Amino acid sequence: MCGRCKTPLLADNKPVTVTDATFLAEVERSPLPVLLDLWAPWCGPCRMVAPVIEEVAAEMAGRVRVAKLNVDENPVTAARFHVQSIPTLLILKGGREMERIVGVQPKAEIVQRLQRIAA
């Protein structure tokens, strides 16, 4: 909440879809830490983790921004972060990678890592 005008700040309660073209504005310039889900539609484990990512976005709204990037459609950003396997979750702050989670992990593990960065 803005201390001046009392409006919510980036109260995203759902993941935002980002592309190579929107990455700078949506992720790098975010005032909040960002959980970036790098995924592809054909990836079974990516589909398994998708509901967890939705829950994390809802629970951490206002403290963390959650974004999803399809690696097949956005190869530039995937290459920039040297993504070798998916799902890969990156926790970014100021556009810099702070943590990397590869593969399906329990929600509690993801939240714990986010809380450390967002504190």
Summary of predicted features, one role per range:
Residues 68:
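Conserved residues in the N-terminal Rossmann fold of short-chain dehydrogenase/reductase
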Residues 1-35, 40-65, 73-119:
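Proteins that catalyze or organize thiol-disulfide redox chemistry
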